[in-house]
């Protein structure tokens, strides 16, 4: 840890205002996570220290609120010396304040990174003098074994309660000063006394009393998981995730053991065993290693430590070390070798009535000898004077709170649980630089500044390797700066299904290779390495698809192309939207905005489905390339339905991109879709007022959510087809060999859908945050201010309870835009102006109206839809929309006849066979769906 700051630096850090939160006083800020800010605080009466974790309810969606409630419920009953206790829980209108035990030494991550300065810290000076950090490693092995014993004790306690933590990492392992202070510590040094959750909160169950006490924190992802159960939600921190979680597979409590192995490796080596700039690359490195965990040659780790790490870091959870084997390992149960003389346990200590032996599995260690408790002594919090700085209660700003039904009693006010030992009276401890209750990563100050090389002993190539390693580490920390990755169950299902199809050998009989897994990440151009941001973004939901109008020729491949030229981003949809924008957006926008100010719209990153290319490819081709007669069988209908649904989603996506581009005039490739305060998003809005920002954000958000629902339905269609094919093949009724063209095409659409869904999800989350930010900047009397919006107006399709203005719906926006585009196209058609553009506008309007009529669920065949409500579209309204679509199709058919005549006139007479153009290939729409089979 860094040395204690000087008075001058400390005075600058104390420039904060004390805030009363119930019976506690909030002091300085000590850490920040994705959704919470951690403050140091004190109990107002006793002046004992606590950590106050303030969670901003406005940043939480429904899933994260459930996680928070689960965390509170779990922590209420977790009373263990090596688990951070929840002391109290207070709630206000905007925040929930978790009052936690205060851990003055911060987290294990900072402890490892600042290991070279531990010798200068008053809390750790004596420890380092006894157990110095050796060259080529991170922490002394005595300290490593001590921390591992305490972590294992916490995990054993959780397993006894059928709990899985799911986010074990150094940042969630907090450290407290040694329960038995070093004899060299001066009583004149600054003193700090934490408020205890129980009498045994700071009495180690295992390990040494002369070394820091480790506590497991942050149970936001913890859940009850019996030994025979499997979970499927992807959560945790990527660097410490088990590979089965990274692969979107179901997992059990053994996922925690992988995380323990990564933490143990980092304590020994100083860095995680696998590092990468994104979770897909991380999984690739884990798979490539093939269970060969390498340690640096100069690392002095013992063989049994290396064997334990390798047993924990098994790729296959079936062959990974079990909890029983881990808890019975000699490193966990045996004595710690290499102890200093003062820490060696006394073997023949006579028993005393006041000595209570622990139930630990290592009777010969110091951790099993609990010093007698002086029952006549005062509680610790009454033995020490309060801190010097004190503000009278009346002078502090008040924060009205309402205590939750749970308020944890402290010290002797409740019965002790199993394995709880009365603590020994300890002398005062000085204050340390604090970092408590699992705060987020802080900036690293002077990284590697204390590392020195012996002169004349390091070759030049080692310096180059060191520089490369530092760059890789920097890139990794930027990519994983966010604490969490949270993916909803739907996201896991979609990505898992897309991966299953991508790697199925039956789809690649005549292809050069499988599709790359990297498309699992959101398809954000030029920033794919950092696109899987979540979390610390809030929540991610995954699914997706899209396609082009059947009346146009296109490539059969649906793989995305991220060209930077204007032509690569130009499509029929973008042309149609731009045409309508140029003529109608001046009055169609609310509030009116000049689209030219936002630059190109849709932005250059927009790649439509399937981009309306000039090449021609049929729906189904046989092995010799000849066109097959597409029979209206079930598989052909599935392809048609899948592509139509994907195309509708793409039209909605293009409309949302227009709004997004006006809201954020920068290219999406330069954006970070995590937070309104993220780098690259603090743009000067210029003439974009808060009212305009709210309007654009609301419209973009509801359109993105509509696109997500259509993409999800596309994946459901493909999933149902996949289940039918597997069932039929298992029964011997069909074979994939004769359906290879269909299956390959569906596979490509699924991969496109997955990529587009991830991209839309990221942008929707960013727009949501921009909406919340813009709403807060509105005047309090504005109708769109959060205080003036009711729950009834909240967007029902969003991933969180975002309050949008009444009447702002995707269906209304899409209907108005389709009507504007069709009217403008009709006027141009009458004046014979830009007839190809008129066709594009008609097709886009039809697709947009079909998206309005589209339901979110796959409807069974033959189910009536008359006089029913479907996704907010009433039966009568549905009839009106169907009539409008029919009229636009009639105009489209008339226009295509006119275009065919013009194309025939322009054909040279010498040509014996007319070469059809993109428009000439169009066929009349089928009555059932309004779409012909794509050609």
Curated annotation (Swiss-Prot):
Biological processes per GO annotation: autophagosome assembly; cellular response to nitrogen starvation; cellular response to potassium ion starvation; mitophagy; piecemeal microautophagy of the nucleus; protein localization to phagophore assembly site; protein transport; regulation of autophagy
Every Protein kinase domain range: 24-332
Keyword NAD: no
Domain of life: Eukaryota
Gene Ontology molecular functions: ATP binding; protein serine kinase activity; protein serine/threonine kinase activity
Any one GO cellular component localisation term in the record: autophagosome
Region annotation (Disordered) ranges: 342-437, 508-569, 905-935
Membrane topology: Peripheral membrane protein
Positions that bind ATP: 30-38, 53
Keyword Nucleus: no
Active-site residue numbers: 167 (proton acceptor)
Enzyme class: transferase
Pfam families referenced in this protein's UniProt entry, alphabetically: ATG1-like_MIT1, ATG1-like_MIT2, Pkinase
Residue stretches of biased makeup (Basic and acidic residues): 375-385, 546-562
Annotated Low complexity bias: 397-406, 922-935
Subunit description: Homodimer. Forms a ternary complex with ATG13 and ATG17.
Family of this protein: Belongs to the protein kinase superfamily. Ser/Thr protein kinase family. APG1/unc-51/ULK1 subfamily.
Function: Serine/threonine protein kinase involved in the cytoplasm to vacuole transport (Cvt) and found to be essential in autophagy, where it is required for the formation of autophagosomes. Involved in the clearance of protein aggregates which cannot be efficiently cleared by the proteasome. Required for selective autophagic degradation of the nucleus (nucleophagy) as well as for mitophagy which contributes to regulate mitochondrial quantity and quality by eliminating the mitochondria to a basal level to fulfill cellular energy requirements and preventing excess ROS production.
Name of the protein described by the UniProt record: Serine/threonine-protein kinase atg1
Organism name: Emericella nidulans (strain FGSC A4 / ATCC 38163 / CBS 112.46 / NRRL 194 / M139)
Gene encoding the protein: atg1
């Amino acid at each position: 840890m860094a040395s204690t700051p000087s008075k001058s630096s400390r005075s600058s850090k104390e420039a904060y205002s004390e805030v009363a939160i119930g019976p506690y006083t909030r002091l300085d800020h000590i850490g920040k996570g994705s959704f919470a800010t951690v403050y140091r605080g004190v109990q107002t009466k006793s002046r004992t220290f606590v950590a106050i974790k303030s969670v901003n309810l406005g940043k939480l969606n429904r899933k994260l609120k459930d996680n928070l409630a689960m965390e509170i419920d779990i922590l209420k009953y977790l009373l263990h010396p090596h688990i951070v206790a929840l002391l109290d829980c207070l709630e206000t209108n905007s925040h929930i304040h978790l009052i936690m035990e205060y851990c003055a030494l911060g987290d294990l991550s900072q402890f490892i990174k600042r290991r070279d300065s531990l010798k200068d810290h008053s809390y750790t000076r004596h420890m380092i003098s006894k157990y110095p950090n050796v060259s080529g490693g991170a922490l002394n092995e005595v300290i490593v074994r001590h921390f591992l014993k305490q972590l294992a004790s916490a995990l054993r306690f959780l397993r006894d309660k059928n709990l899985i933590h799911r986010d074990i990492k150094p940042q969630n392992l907090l450290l407290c000063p040694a329960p038995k202070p070093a004899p060299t510590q001066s009583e004149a040094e600054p003193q700090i006394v934490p408020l205890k959750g129980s009498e045994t909160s700071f009495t180690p169950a295992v390990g040494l009393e002369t070394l820091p006490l480790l506590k497991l924190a942050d149970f936001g992802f913890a859940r009850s998981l019996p030994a025979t159960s499997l979970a499927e939600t992807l959560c945790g921190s990527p660097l410490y995730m088990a590979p089965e979680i990274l692969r979107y597979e179901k997992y059990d409590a053994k996922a925690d053991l992988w995380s323990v192995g990564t933490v143990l490796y980092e304590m020994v080596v100083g860095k995680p065993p696998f590092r990468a700039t994104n979770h897909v690359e991380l999984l690739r490195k884990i798979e490539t290693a093939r269970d060969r965990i390498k340690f640096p040659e100069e690392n002095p780790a013992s063989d049994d430590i290396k064997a334990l790490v390798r047993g924990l870091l098994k790729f296959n959870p079936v062959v990974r070390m079990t909890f029983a084997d881990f808890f019975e390992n000699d490193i966990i149960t045996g004595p710690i070798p290499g102890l200093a003389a003062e820490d060696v346990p006394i073997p023949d200590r006579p028993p005393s009535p006041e000595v209570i032996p622990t139930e630990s599995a290592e009777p010969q260690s110091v951790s099993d000898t609990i010093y007698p408790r002086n029952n006549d002594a005062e509680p610790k919090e009454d033995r020490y004077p309060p801190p010097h700085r004190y503000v009278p209660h009346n002078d502090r700003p008040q924060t009205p709170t309402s205590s939750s039904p749970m308020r944890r009693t402290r010290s002797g006010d409740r019965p002790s649980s199993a394995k709880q030992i009365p603590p020994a009276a300890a002398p005062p401890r000085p204050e340390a630089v604090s970092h408590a209750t699992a705060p987020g990563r802080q900036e690293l100050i002077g990284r590697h500044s204390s590392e020195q090389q012996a002169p004349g002993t390091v070759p030049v190539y080692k310096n180059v390797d060191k520089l490369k390693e530092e760059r890789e580490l920097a890139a990794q920390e930027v990519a994983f700066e966010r604490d969490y990755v949270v993916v909803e169950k739907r996201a896991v299902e979609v990505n898992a299904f897309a991966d299953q199809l991508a790697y199925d050998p039956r789809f690649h009989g005549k292809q050069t290779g499988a599709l790359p897994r990297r498309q699992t990440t959101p398809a954000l151009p030029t920033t794919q390495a950092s696109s899987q941001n979540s979390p610390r973004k809030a929540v991610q939901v995954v699914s997706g698809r899209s396609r082009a109008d059947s009346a146009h020729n296109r490539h059969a491949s649906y793989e995305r192309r991220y060209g930077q030229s204007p032509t690569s981003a130009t499509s029929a949809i973008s042309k149609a939207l731009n045409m309508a924008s140029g003529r109608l957006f001046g009055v169609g926008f609310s509030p009116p905005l000049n689209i030219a100010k936002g630059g190109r719209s849709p932005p250059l990153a927009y790649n439509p489905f399937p981009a309306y290319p000039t090449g021609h490819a049929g729906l189904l081709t046989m092995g010799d390339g000849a066109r097959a007669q597409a029979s209206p069988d079930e598989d052909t209908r599935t392809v048609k339905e899948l592509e139509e649904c994907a195309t509708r989603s793409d039209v909605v996506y293009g409309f949302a991109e227009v709004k997004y581009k006006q809201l954020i005039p920068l290219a999406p490739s330069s954006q970070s879709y995590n937070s309104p305060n993220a780098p690259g998003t603090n743009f000067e809005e210029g003439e974009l007022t808060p009212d305009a920002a709210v309007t654009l954000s609301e419209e973009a958000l509801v359109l993105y959510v509509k696109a997500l629902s259509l993409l999800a339905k596309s994946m459901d269609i493909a999933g149902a087809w996949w289940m039918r094919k597997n069932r039929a093949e298992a029964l011997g009724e069909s074979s994939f060999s004769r359906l290879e063209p269909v299956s390959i095409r569906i596979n490509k659409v699924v991969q496109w859908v997955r990529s587009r869904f991830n991209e839309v999800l990221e942008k929707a989350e960013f727009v949501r945050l921009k909406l919340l930010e813009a709403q807060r900047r509105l005047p309090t009397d504005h109708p769109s201010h959060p205080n003036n919006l009711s729950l009834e107006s909240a967007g029902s399709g969003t991933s969180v309870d975002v309050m949008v203005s009444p009447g702002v719906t995707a269906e209304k926006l899409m209907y108005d835009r389709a009507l504007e585009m069709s009217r403008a196209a009709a006027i141009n058609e009458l004046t014979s102006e830009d007839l190809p553009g008129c066709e594009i506008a008609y097709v886009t309007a039809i697709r947009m109206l079909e998206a309005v009529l589209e339901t979110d669920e796959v409807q069974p065949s033959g189910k009536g839809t008359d006089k029913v409500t479907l996704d907010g579209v009433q039966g009568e309204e549905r009839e009106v929309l169907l009539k409008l679509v029919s009229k636009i199709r009639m105009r489209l058919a008339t226009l295509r006849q006119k275009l065919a005549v013009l194309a025939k006139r322009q054909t040279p007479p010498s040509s014996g066979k007319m070469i059809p153009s993109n428009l000439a290939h169009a066929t009349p729409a089928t009555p059932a769906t309004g779409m012909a089979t794509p050609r």
